[in-house]
Curated annotation (Swiss-Prot):
Residues 1-31 form the signal peptide. GO terms for biological process: peptidoglycan turnover. InterPro entries: 3D_dom (IPR010611), Resuscitation_pf_RpfB (IPR051933), RlpA-like_sf (IPR036908). The lineage of its organism: Bacteria, Bacillati, Bacillota, Bacilli, Bacillales. It comes from the Bacteria. This is Uncharacterized protein YuiC. PANTHER family: CELL WALL-BINDING PROTEIN YOCH (PTHR39160), RESUSCITATION-PROMOTING FACTOR RPFB (PTHR39160:SF4). GO terms for cellular component: outer membrane. CDD domains: DPBB_YuiC-like. Gene3D superfamilies: RlpA-like domain. One of its GO terms (molecular function) is hydrolase activity, hydrolyzing O-glycosyl compounds. It comes from Bacillus subtilis (strain 168).
């Protein structure tokens, strides 16, 4: 029995040797050449895979950029006609002496009648006659954005609005004086707090529009 096992083992070894010799002879490929071919093939495959991944990443970046570029302005993103309309005459104001008589350093500089600080943002602070638009009223003002009534003014009576801008230059370049229809999104209760204004400006569903209005300070 031992002799039979040795005989089978020898036959197997001879078969494998003959097969390997035949393969190398027919193909003309030496073992070292075969190893080199396998390595080169793997490197080529990995290179192609890397190029495909890079192309996919570039395509994804281009798609994201295109989506951002296609973001509609706030005016076109919603059906504002669903809300009550009010005809107003709107002007612009700043926190400075030219509008409020106050200068930086004054404890009341930049503070509105409601106590919140003036802000140009997704929801900006605006001044109105509280008998027409109570403090806290949210308005959509075409070409200006969303405004929250947080301030009043001695000259702001009736259907008048004063829209906050950072500088006098912004007032003249971006607004001036306009008569237009505004949309009453929500009637105010007579008050507004910093926390409430901040929450409005952090509304997740509207962040895509925020950079259209937010003033970026260095």
């Amino acid at each position: 029995m031992m002799l039979n096992m040795i005989r089978r083992l020898l036959m197997t070894c001879l078969f494998l040797l003959a097969f390997g010799t035949t393969f190398l002879s027919v193909s003309g490929i030496e073992a070292k050449d075969l190893s080199k071919w396998v390595q080169e093939h793997q490197e080529k495959h990995l290179k192609h895979a890397g190029l495909r991944l890079k192309a996919l990443q570039q395509k994804q970046t281009q798609t994201t950029s295109a989506a951002e570029d296609k973001t509609k302005p706030l005016e076109e993103a919603f059906d504002w006609d669903e809300y009550p309309v009010q005809r107003v005459t709107a002007t612009g104001y700043t926190a400075g002496a030219e509008s409020t008589g106050k200068n930086p350093g004054d404890p009341l500089y930049g503070l509105t009648y409601s106590g919140v600080k003036v802000k140009r943002d997704l929801y900006s602070t605006v001044a109105a006659d509280p008998s027409v638009f109570p403090i806290g009223t949210i308005l959509f003002i075409p070409n200006y954005g969303l405004g929250v009534v947080a301030d009043t003014g001695s000259a702001i009576k009736g259907n008048r609005l004063d829209l906050y801008f950072e500088t006098v230059k912004d007032v003249y370049n971006e607004w001036g004086k306009k008569t237009l229809d505004v949309y009453v999104i929500k009637k105010g209760t007579g008050k507004i707090t910093e926390d409430e204004l901040e929450k409005l400006n952090e509304t997740k569903s509207l962040q895509v529009f925020r950079n259209q209005y937010k003033t970026v300070k260095e």
